[in-house]
Amino acid sequence: VEVAFVRNGKLVRVERVVPEGVEQELHALRELVQGPTRLERRQGIRTAIPEGARVRAISADGEVWLTSFSRSLLGMGAPETKVTRLAQIAATLAPLGDQEYASVATEGRLVTSLRLGMRPDVWRAETGENDYQYVVRGIQLRLWLLGYLDRTDVTGSLDYSTEQALVAFQGWEDLDRTGTVTGQTQIALSTAARPEPTAHRPGKRIEIYRDRGVLLMVDTGEVVRVVHTSTGAGGVTPVGAFRVYVKALMSWSVPFKVWMPYAAYFTGGIATHQSPDVPSYPASHGCVRLPEGEAERVYRFVDVGTPVVVR
């Protein structure tokens, strides 16, 4: 394998022999944190990885390397030094498989996510619970890879779209739905997988999980989007298998005297629709409330006849 170090401010690769029976990716990262040999140092090769850093875990999940290091990896150091550390990790992992991204955690808590083959962004970290750091853009990139956010919403700003994505993620993972980057959220993000639907069938379908407050958009057995939702208070949204029977860009609710944008009705007078109030608990009179932006996405996704499963 090749390990990425630094010489004269540029990344250089040095070869390491992988012992028999050891996974190449694990050995590569172990060699990375161990640093250059004495001979390599005499040749001007250095590393930005701090002495004493350790590899905790590495595994592959589809197109993503999931990595975890000791907390010291991103402890002391100037912002540019931390960017170089991440660049060394990315450059070491890039040749080892078909993965295009890497998530980087410390002690099992996600810090950031990287696009392999590209230099990491400027280090702008927030301080979370117990002083564990995280990079907002890296959190957003991870949420996008898991199906909770648009790629265009990876902006580095904790905005409304990111808050809704976090609530959806927390609901699916059975965490407190705060819409913020809690410690438990960092832990879950470090190893989470994209949600799986209940059935892998051809065509499009919608799955709604009342207790989790989550709607899954499923296309040919793959979850293409995970959306935060609020269903009926007291469990009044019926459980069962239904189909969309009518769509309306703007529907008027006669009993509640309110407009419901992007309504897709699937049983009785119950529909998915946009709402300005989508709390992290069941609060509606039976309909499936969706956040601004997500409601239109669901509306465009479904057709009359699209299956809707409520659980």
Ranges and model annotations:
Residues 33-38, 91-98, 141-149, 167-175, ...:
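Sec-exported extracytoplasmic/periplasmic mature domains
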Residues 93-104, 199-201, 235-241, 246-311:
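Exported/periplasmic cell-wall-interacting domains
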Residues 158, 167, 171-235:
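Cell wall/extracellular polymer interaction/catalysis modules
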Residues 39-56, 83-89, 189-204, 227-231, ...:
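N-terminal post-signal-peptidase region of extra-cytosolic proteins
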Residues 1-138:
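Bimodal "functional hotspot" detector
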Residues 129-137, 141-188:
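Short acidic, glycine/serine/threonine-rich helix-capping segments at coil-helix boundaries
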Residues 7, 59-62, 69-73, 106-108, ...:
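A mature extracytoplasmic/lumenal domain signature
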Residues 26-33, 52, 83-90, 136-143, ...:
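Extracytoplasmic/secreted envelope proteins and their assembly/folding machinery
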